[in-house]
Amino acid sequence: MNVRANRVSEQMKKELGDILNRKIKDPRLGFVTVTGVDVTGDLQEAKVFISILGTDKEKENTLLALAKAHGFIRSEIGRRIRLRKVPEMSFEIDNSIAYGNRIDELLRDLNSDQ
């Protein structure tokens, strides 16, 4: 990723966090944290990684709410970030936090057994 794509990625991460927590009023939207944004070098596509707190059903409902609000989110990003064309976004669940918590739990169990 080039320098400009990195800057756009960081700015999108910040703005998406604000949009998801303050602007979208969908009750299906759970507690969402934007953990990262990968933007292609030509700034045409962005993969948004999110962490969702809750059960599998709540995660599914949150993804449905994000899919429904996709157009609104893109228009808000377009207003906040000066780009010729707003990247096409796809949302993916980031399981790295849950994976890290599981490893910590296993390590604590190993230490308590000794």
Swiss-Prot record:
Subcellular location: Cytoplasm
Molecular functions per Gene Ontology: ribosomal small subunit binding
Biological process, per Gene Ontology: maturation of SSU-rRNA
Record's keyword terms, sorted: Cytoplasm, Ribosome biogenesis
InterPro entries, per database record: KH_dom-like_a/b, RbfA, RbfA_dom_sf, Ribosome-bd_factorA_CS
Record has Transmembrane helix as a keyword: no
GO cellular component: cytosol
Domain of life: Bacteria
Entry annotated with the keyword Cell division: no
Family statement drawn from the similarity comment of this UniProt entry: Belongs to the RbfA family.
Subunit relationships: Monomer. Binds 30S ribosomal subunits, but not 50S ribosomal subunits or 70S ribosomes.
HAMAP family assigned to the protein according to its UniProt record, in alphabetical order: RbfA
Known function: One of several proteins that assist in the late maturation steps of the functional core of the 30S ribosomal subunit. Associates with free 30S ribosomal subunits (but not with 30S subunits that are part of 70S ribosomes or polysomes). Required for efficient processing of 16S rRNA. May interact with the 5'-terminal helix region of 16S rRNA.
PANTHER family per record: RIBOSOME-BINDING FACTOR A, CHLOROPLASTIC-RELATED
Official protein name in the record: Ribosome-binding factor A
Species, as recorded: Listeria welshimeri serovar 6b (strain ATCC 35897 / DSM 20650 / CCUG 15529 / CIP 8149 / NCTC 11857 / SLCC 5334 / V8)
Gene name linked to the record: rbfA
